Amino acid sequence: MNNTPPVTKNLIIINILCFFAAIVAERYGVNLNDVLGLHYFESEKFRLYQLFTYMFMHSGFEHILFNMFAVWMFGRILETVWGPQRFLFYYVLCGIGAGLVQEVTQYFEFLPVMHDMAQFLTFPSEASIPINGTTRSAEQWVAICQRIISVPTVGASGAVYAILMAFGMMFPNQEIFIIPLPMPIKAKWLIIGYFVLELGMGIMSNDGIAHFAHLGGMIFGFLLIMYWRKKGGGYGRYS
């Protein structure tokens, strides 16, 4: 860590401090992830500042370990190339952008449920409700609604995926070893693979992971780097 540039180092330190602060606060009955995590915008728990604070909170040790390792591995290179101010701007903006994409995703996930729930309340004699081709009991749909409204999004993953996107765009032919792959893979193929994987998981999976927030970070990162390349200034080099 001695050779890690300042913004990268401080981001890792802040995330670790927030992680342990959440553990300590929980012992006193305070759920910091619930306070600082990003809630759905129609929830009574939503606060605008959560679009910033959510990216410093994590759900578990593995979650923060992966994210901070990626920040250290790729972020220090980007900060060296861009400088601390531009790297911090990129990190924060893409993290906020990922949060906005997550909010929009939840809105479209929530909209058909609420529409069909309203129809059910009009004709409450039905034992189950078909929504988007899936039939569940009223209690199950209520549980889904409660999850969307009450469970916050936490983690630096949106910003981390933006960092991966930036690395892949700036160093597309750099070979990277990824466990458990037996051979190195070029950064450009790694980024494409991650994008396709996250898109597929976001559409097909119900694993509780904010896949579209990951995609949002990548998309915001891509657009920002393309803007910098168009504007000029050497922030989007190829190698």
What are these regions (language model features)?
Residues 1-239:
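A detector for small-residue-rich transmembrane helices and their helix-helix packing motifs
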